[in-house]
Amino acid sequence: MAIHGIFFGSDTGNTENIAKMIQKQLGKDVADVHDIAKSSKEDLEAYDILLLGIPTWYYGEAQCDWDDFFPTLEEIDFNGKLVALFGCGDQEDYAEYFCDALGTIRDIIEPRGATIDADWPTAGYHFQASKGLADDDHFVGLAIDEDRHPELTADRVEKWVKQISEELHLDEILNA
């Protein structure tokens, strides 16, 4: 088993593809990828470092598999766990709800002890509002728009993986 658990929910395949891009950059021996629809509480508890991928649907709704998993997520003690979030949204058609699900999942795991890191700058995005903001200038995690700007995805993922590797001290953990 790898030391990082990447968990995603996806209806269209976009968030799954992002999860696999992240795994490829980190290394398959370092990160396991799991579909949240096929995951259990014990699957998440097995990792000290979690990367959680959640897309936002329509008017700020969480993807259905995550929505179904939220009661289980509420049972997990996240104390001692490092968490980085990533998510997909549509900043044009749903500009007032862009990546809201990032905020939804943060609001579930943060009170349960999760240390959430890896904020991502809002610069370069064009949206009206988001519950997925850490502050006025940052999302709580990586925000991806595969609907409007798929050409930016690979570069954003690469930069974010480098960022989380530094912020979560992944090199130190791997070499310990």
Swiss-Prot record:
Stretches assigned to the Flavodoxin-like domain: 4-165
The UniProt record lists the keyword rRNA-binding: no
Pfam families in UniProt: Flavodoxin_1 (PF00258)
Cofactor: FMN
Residue stretches spanning the membrane: none
Recorded GO MF terms: electron transfer activity; FMN binding
InterPro entries: Flavodoxin, Flavodoxin/NO_synth, Flavodoxin_CS, Flavodoxin_lc, Flavoprotein-like_sf
Alphabetically ordered keywords of this record: Electron transport, Flavoprotein, FMN, Transport
NCBIfam families the record matches: flav_long (TIGR01752), PRK09267.1-1 (NF006735), PRK09267.1-3 (NF006737), PRK09267.1-5 (NF006739)
Function: Low-potential electron donor to a number of redox enzymes.
Similarity comment: Belongs to the flavodoxin family.
PANTHER family named among the record's database cross-references: FLAVODOXIN 1 (PTHR42809:SF1), FLAVODOXIN 2 (PTHR42809)
Protein name listed in UniProt: Flavodoxin 1
Gene: fldA
